[in-house]
Amino acid sequence: CLVGSEMCIRDRVSCMPRTSREHVKPVRQKWFGVACCPPNITRTLASLGQYIYFQEENEIYVNLYVANETEVTLNGVPFKITLKGNFPWENKMTVSVDGVQETEAMIAFRVPAYAENFKILRNGKEENLTEDHGYIKISGKMYKETFEISFDAEPVFVPANPQVRVDSAKVAVVKGPLVYCVEEADNGENLSSVMVNTDQKIEETYDDELLEGCSVLHITGKKISEKGWNEGILYQNRKVELEDVKLTLVPYCYWGNRENGEMLVWMKELFYM
């Protein structure tokens, strides 16, 4: 479960036994000698409004789709703005703009780089959208308005630049703003021997019970079989055999909240020559 009382001090992209575990703990810790994490969380939450919104005179910019309520003044008129939704599990938000009286104003909605088929309904009617420097700007008379935002963000395989030596010929799985990982809790040990074919469609399900509820991704892959290897012998003149595996991926930000085990973000890509 997600208690929130323990944390990671390093954002590593893999956790393997007897290597990184020797100097980086494989489980979340309650406290560190350098206590930067708790106050950083506090500062971020306290300043979150500055990240969600940007205001300039009679213009308000919505940068992040985080459920919240705020009060602003546009053209001298007080407005209450409310964002409701279940992002990033659902790619839709409802934005209510409630003014004391009607006035001229502009509201701008950021279009995330990963968003496809971005749509906005204003009071139930679809708006003609023109993107300007990453934002959809809607100007005119504002009073009591409801904006319904929706877009697609399918999970995809993302390769590493070949100049990144340790991740060359490897891929990560990303959905919208979330990076995913495989954990030993779902997929067994020796995750470094897993390979995936990036031509497949990534399946997505929502698990109400897992980690307080989150979107889980499912893919198929190959894993180097350990059958026939002589115990204690590191190298053998033999053919490598592969076996089929089904892999479950969870959001990277949630890793380490279950059993102590391996974790991997970058997986080897399976090439067919």
Locate the predicted segments by residue.
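Catalytic cores of secreted or luminal carbohydrate-active enzymes
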Residues: R10-E90
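Edge strands and adjacent loops of beta-rich recognition modules
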Residues: Y53-G99, A108-R110, L249, G256-M273
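Glycine/proline-rich low-complexity spacer/linker segments in large multi-domain proteins
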Residues: F151-W229, Y254
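Short proline/glycine-enriched turn/loop motifs at strand-loop junctions of beta-rich domains
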Residues: E102, V111-E116
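Single conserved hydrophobic/aromatic residue that forms the stacking wall/gate
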Residues: C1-I9
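C-terminal beta-strand-rich structural cap/linker in extracellular carbohydrate-active enzymes
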Residues: A105-A108, I138-V156, E183
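Solvent-exposed beta-strand/loop surfaces of large extracellular or lumenal domains
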Residues: A115-G140, F157-Q163
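Activation corresponds to long, low-complexity, non-globular regions
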Residues: E204-M273
